[in-house]
C-alpha cells in the first residue's frame, strides 16, 4: 500500500493527548509512524557524558505517532480530510477526497 502522507504535509491529530492540534510532518519512520513537529512531546532523562562535554538533564522531544491517529489538513475547509490517488497527464497525484483538488 502506498503511503498517502508525505514529509511537510499539514496534519491534524485525531486521538491522544494532542487531539485536535495541527502540525507539520517532520519525519516518516518505518512501522507506519510519523513524527509531527512540536506535538506528542515526551520528557527524556539524559545522562551527562563528560567525555563529549554533554550535560545531563530532562529534555523534551517529539515521539512517533501512528499514521492511523493523524489525518491530512485541508487548507480550504481547515478540517481533516482523506487522500486519494489519480493519474493526471501521466503522473500519479494525490487529491483531497472531499473537494477533489490536487495536493501540492
Swiss-Prot record:
Keywords in alphabetical order: Ribonucleoprotein, Ribosomal protein, RNA-binding, rRNA-binding
PANTHER family: MITOCHONDRIAL RIBOSOMAL PROTEIN L24
The keyword Transmembrane belongs to this UniProt entry's keyword annotation: no
GO BP terms in the entry: translation
Domain of life: Bacteria
InterPro entries: KOW, Rib_uL2_dom2, Ribosomal_uL24, Ribosomal_uL24_CS, Ribosomal_uL24_KOW, Translation_prot_SH3-like_sf
Protein species of origin: Buchnera aphidicola subsp. Acyrthosiphon pisum (strain APS) (Acyrthosiphon pisum symbiotic bacterium)
Protein name: Large ribosomal subunit protein uL24
Any one GO cellular component localisation term in the record: ribosome
Family: Belongs to the universal ribosomal protein uL24 family.
Subunit structure: Part of the 50S ribosomal subunit.
Matches recorded under HAMAP family: Ribosomal_uL24_B (MF_01326_B)
Pfam families assigned: KOW, ribosomal_L24
GO molecular function: rRNA binding; structural constituent of ribosome
Function: One of two assembly initiator proteins, it binds directly to the 5'-end of the 23S rRNA, where it nucleates assembly of the 50S subunit. One of the proteins that surrounds the polypeptide exit tunnel on the outside of the subunit.
Amino acid at each position: 500500500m502506498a503511503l498517502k502522507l508525505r514529509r511537510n504535509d499539514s496534519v491534524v491529530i485525531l486521538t491522544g493527548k494532542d487531539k485536535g492540534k495541527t502540525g507539520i510532518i517532520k519525519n516518516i519512520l518505518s512501522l507506519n509512524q510519523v513524527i509531527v513537529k512540536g506535538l506528542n512531546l515526551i520528557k527524556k532523562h539524559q545522562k551527562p557524558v563528560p567525555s563529549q562535554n554533554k550535560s545531563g538533564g530532562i529534555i523534551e522531544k517529539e515521539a512517533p505517532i501512528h499514521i492511523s491517529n493523524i489525518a491530512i489538513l485541508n487548507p480550504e475547509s481547515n478540517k481533516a480530510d482523506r487522500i486519494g490517488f489519480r493519474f493526471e497527464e501521466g503522473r500519479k497525484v494525490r487529491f483531497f477526497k472531499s473537494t477533489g483538488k490536487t495536493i501540492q
